[in-house]
């Protein structure tokens, strides 16, 4: 990925729900991760829907909240594209937009962040988040 890494997390996929099968398969998925964002520890929870595309890839749209250990919140909305990889795992890449009143996390209000999100066959998740404005500022 390009840009400065500003966050990462590890956790578990939660509930999965089939929303439709025609004309495309559409599923809703929730997850929860122990995460850091701009060096601040917390919990990241989110829900996304994934729809199959004609080539077998996935289009995902989601939203969630990062809660710091001292009670501050950052909401996020994202969209991305996913691919099935080996052994039943899924790999997504996409973009996030954040909103917060937290002073220490206020930088998030003005950036578009790029993410990588992986879910293995057992439901374990891993995420990495990058500040794309860092790259643009140095281009």
State where each predicted segment sits.
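Beta-strand-enriched cores of mature, soluble protein domains
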Residues: 1-139
């Amino acid at each position: 990925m390009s840009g400065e890494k500003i966050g990462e997390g590890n956790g578990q996929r939660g509930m999965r729900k089939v929303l439709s099968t025609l004309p495309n398969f559409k599923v809703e998925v929730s997850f929860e991760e122990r995460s850091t964002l701009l060096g601040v520890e917390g919990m990241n929870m989110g829900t996304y829907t994934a729809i199959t595309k004609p080539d077998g890839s996935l289009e995902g749209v989601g939203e969630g909240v990062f809660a710091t250990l001292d009670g501050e919140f950052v909401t996020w909305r994202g969209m991305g594209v996913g691919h099935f990889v080996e052994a039943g795992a899924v790999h997504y890449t996409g973009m996030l937009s954040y909103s917060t009143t937290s002073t220490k996390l206020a930088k998030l209000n003005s950036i578009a962040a790029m993410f990588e999100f992986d879910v293995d066959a057992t439901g374990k998740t891993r995420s990495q988040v990058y500040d794309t404005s860092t790259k643009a500022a140095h281009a």
